[in-house]
Amino acid sequence: MKEYQVYLERARSRQQDFLYPLIFREYIYGLAYSQNFNRSIFVENLGYDNKYSLLIVKRLITRMYQQNHLIISANDSNKNPFLGYNKNFYSQIISEGFAIVVEIPFFLELSSSLEEPEIIKSYKNVRSIHSIFPFLEDKLTHLNYVSDIRIPYPIHLEILVQILRYWVKDAPFFHLLRLFLYNFCNWNSFITTKKSISTFSKSNPRLFLFLYHFYVCEYESIFLFLRNKSSHLRLKSFSVFFERIFFYAKREHLVEVFAKDFSYTLTFFKDPLIHYVRYQGKCILASKNAPFLMNKWKHYFIHLWQGFFDVWSQPRTININQLSEHSFQLLGYFLNVRLNRSVVRSQMLQNTFLIEIVSKKLDIIVPIIPLIRSLAKAKFCNVLGHPISKPVWADSSDFDIIDRFLRICRNLSHYYNGSSKKKSLYQIKYILRLSCIKTLACKHKSTVRAFLKRSGSEELLEAFFTEEEEILSLIFPRDSSTLHRLNRNRIWYLDILFSNDLVNDE
């Protein structure tokens, strides 16, 4: 680890060509293993213990030294001289090494920014999941229009590498990265399909997440720049910004560029109440003003993806809807703004008036059907929601089986405590409860009724329904009216760091 830190200090003074040698260092792979991102990447399936093998890494580095100068042609692509005989196994190890190495420049930039307070302002747009909750509670009810946008995947993963090259100037490293990706990911096709991207993301999660998140951050940095300068922009002058070579020069000398090139297209366009929220691959664009301005921003998104990232997206895929008539999905919730109408009688002197008051209320609904679909995918129930046993857990002890089911139930209750109607979670708890009982009965080779009668486990399984109330009673006074009121209100817990694993907003 000391050698790693010394190399980082040397890399601070060298602005380029410092990543390539790291891929041949053994301690890089040891660092990847110590982070325990993928427990099985350093283990050959030969019956040995699941431990980090320095011999495997030495063998891999030797092969890379011998073969990294080769350029694989179309005739030799099937032989795969770069990865050797055990392609999938070595590819996973190299992928982890690439993921560690490529994060180093950004770690250096972040650590240097922490030493200089004025640079921290560049990271002010970085927010956690907790910043979304106040937006939902405080801002959403005051907005009228919303656009639910799915950020498209790039048409080819080569685009991700090219975006990264603008920030990291290390040509040998990127040549080696391309050589690895072309061999392992089959990038010979002109268009990378969504299925191949999904396969790559599952087999190399860390490297893919880094490349994809960097792509999203790059798109957001340009979007936020355009958002801040929107008073100077017009649609027909917007595409000029996608010349990558001049983009940062234009951003630094915005006034001079506008005065020289865009003086004939300057118009006033400002929407001070437009809000942008993103989580994972979905973003929400909301505004209080007329849909005309929202339509402007929709075309900005289309031109941004097509002209800068070579991502084809059609305008009809982005819909602009009224919040009062449309619900959208975010963070595993269904959200809509409901209009509550009430009539108030007002009297002035001898005249009486009926005044209609319209108030907005935010409804945050638990998506029961997607949750049941996720439970069915995880083999807790069938597609109709009927509970089934979990035979793969039957080898564990009774306590471990019950604890696993309780942990899932606890996480779901904890995460969805911000919903308006928490009683809808009882159906999910019921499925998990019966699935737990059927799993225990399957383990003991008995029926559900006979197992419950013999073991008396029914009282223990009541924890599926009582645990959340016990947690609240530890925080708040043990008053039935207080707990009943808290059960109706939304509570956002601060220990929620990511969306629930059973929630998939694809």
UniProtKB/Swiss-Prot annotation:
Highest rank taxon of the organism: Eukaryota
Pfam short name (any one): Intron_maturas2
InterPro entries the record matches: Domain_X, Maturase_MatK, Maturase_MatK_N
Coiled-coil residue windows: none
Keywords: Chloroplast, mRNA processing, Plastid, RNA-binding, tRNA processing
Localization, UniProt: Plastid, Chloroplast
Chief location: plastid
GO CC annotations on file: chloroplast
GO term, biological process aspect, one: RNA splicing
A single MF term (Gene Ontology): RNA binding
Record's function text: Usually encoded in the trnK tRNA gene intron. Probably assists in splicing its own and other chloroplast group II introns.
UniProt similarity note: Belongs to the intron maturase 2 family. MatK subfamily.
Name of this protein: Maturase K
Organism: Melilotus indicus
Gene of this entry: matK
